[in-house]
Swiss-Prot record:
Naturally occurring in which organism (per UniProt): Corynebacterium jeikeium (strain K411)
Cofactor details (free text): Binds 1 Mg(2+) ion per subunit. The magnesium is bound as Mg-PRPP.
Catalytic reaction equation(s): UMP + diphosphate = 5-phospho-alpha-D-ribose 1-diphosphate + uracil
EC id: 2.4.2.9
Reported regulation of activity: Allosterically activated by GTP.
GO biological process per UniProt: UMP salvage; uracil salvage
Gene name tied to this protein: upp
GO molecular function: GTP binding; magnesium ion binding; uracil phosphoribosyltransferase activity
Protein name: Uracil phosphoribosyltransferase
Length: 212
């Protein structure tokens, strides 16, 4: 698996806003939107393109477009915040959904939604989730995608923890690339990323009020 930590001043500045505990929901959402677009831009660099003839106002030239736009699959709830940034970069992408919440006692993922095409074989997939902590939720999502034939999966996570990255590598699943803004060193006893940015879903939308 190829791991790309995107090192850029604008990426670092938006990540800093998201990390700051004093950033309110609106500031956090705005920074996440900007950062999401930047990471999707970077993750798209290896997508296959095709060329076609087009007319400008003054001449004929060759244009470029994606041969097969990826399907964007957010792990919701927090991944919902990455849909609009992804579509701003790739407006003709399809969107699927995988819903998972975290059991706050066991720290294990609890799936509650799967809305995906039946056949994902030979279809580029961008699996997006702001946080890669233990890797449990992402690995569960990856196995769901693989069960539908996905063999070209790119994970886009804003903040990744080293234990989660290690779990992804050791699981030997069909992920070709991981794009992230940072790899933080550790998790605390509640399985939150340290230094991290807290609970991305809560900071986007407010506290979750559904009992699992």
């Amino acid at each position: 698996m190829e791991i790309q930590v995107v090192n850029h001043p604008l990426v670092a500045s938006r990540l800093s806003i998201m990390r700051d505990k004093n950033s309110d929901n609106a500031q956090f959402r705005a920074a996440l939107s900007d950062l999401g677009a930047m990471l999707i831009y970077e993750a798209s660099a290896d997508l296959v393109v095709e060329h076609f003839e087009l007319e400008t106002p003054v001449a004929t030239t060759t244009g470029t477009r994606l041969e097969k736009p990826p399907i964007i699959v957010p792990v919701i709830r927090a991944g919902l915040g990455m849909i609009d940034p992804a579509l701003s970069m790739i407006p003709d992408a399809q969107v699927g959904f995988i819903g998972m919440a975290r059991d706050e006692t066991t720290h294990e993922p609890v799936p509650y939604l799967e809305a995906l095409p039946d056949d994902l074989s030979d279809q580029p997939v961008f699996l997006v989730d702001p946080m890669l902590a233990t890797g449990g939720s992402l690995l569960h999502a990856i196995r769901l995608l693989e069960g539908r034939g996905a063999n070209d999966i790119t994970c886009v996570c804003m903040v990744s923890a080293q234990p989660g990255v290690d779990a992804l590598v050791e699981a030997n699943v069909g992920v070709r690339r991981l794009y992230t803004a940072t790899i933080d060193p550790s998790l605390n006893k509640e399985a939150y990323i340290v230094p991290g940015l807290g609970d991305a879903g809560d900071r986007l939308y407010g506290p979750r009020n559904i009992d699992l």
